[in-house]
């Protein structure tokens, strides 16, 4: 498969066919790419062709790989509206591959200079600092995620859960204590012998069991009077006793 020269270092989109299949490639270059770095352009073309062949040979398991001068990051995405396209090579109808391959290319020296943090002439200082800050942020995030798992330093989420559980258990214990206290006071104080007095606590807003007042000693009650006769007979009996009428009749 012979390829036309690439537009390095400018991005481009190429349609390549192998057999009866058509493949769409997007080639994108990173900020570390400079056109004047490599004088022999034939070397660049050969490395790009080898990169495309490597991608076609490993379409189902794409992984980053390294050439003599570049680091290639291959990606695969869906080819939109590919069913509406038709390709022919002479009289042969070609079948388009339903995915698009995108190659992100960086200079090999770019990755080698990142661990030391020292920028080279090919890499701007701002780019190196940005990469180092991203790495430090990742390390801090990983450290924060690992800290809650240690028993000595529980994370904020775990501490919040423990505080809520302790508060709920304390509230439940207070309710049980109040219930048992009320039952004991009811058992110790019969309703027929004494009277229970409850006071209202203005701060807590609930009734508290009060003091128990001993029963009062009552003297013997006076005998009940017979109900007086009512009506006209009662009025007559009040004026003239009955024995007066019986005495008159006997005479």
Swiss-Prot record:
InterPro entries according to UniProt: MAJIN (IPR027816)
One Pfam family hit: MAJIN
Species classification: Eukaryota, Metazoa, Chordata, Craniata, Vertebrata
Alphabetically ordered keywords of this record: Chromosome, DNA-binding, Meiosis, Membrane, Nucleus, Telomere, Transmembrane, Transmembrane helix
Comp. bias regions, Polar residues: 183-198
Topology of the protein relative to the lipid bilayer: Single-pass membrane protein
Source organism (scientific name): Rattus norvegicus
UniProt topological domain (Nuclear) ranges: 1-227
Quaternary structure and interacting proteins, as annotated: Component of the MAJIN-TERB1-TERB2 complex, composed of MAJIN, TERB1 and TERB2.
Residues that span the membrane, as ranges: 228-246
Protein's UniProt name: Membrane-anchored junction protein
A GO cellular component annotation in the UniProt record: chromosome, telomeric region
Function comment: Meiosis-specific telomere-associated protein involved in meiotic telomere attachment to the nucleus inner membrane, a crucial step for homologous pairing and synapsis. Component of the MAJIN-TERB1-TERB2 complex, which promotes telomere cap exchange by mediating attachment of telomeric DNA to the inner nuclear membrane and replacement of the protective cap of telomeric chromosomes: in early meiosis, the MAJIN-TERB1-TERB2 complex associates with telomeric DNA and the shelterin/telosome complex.
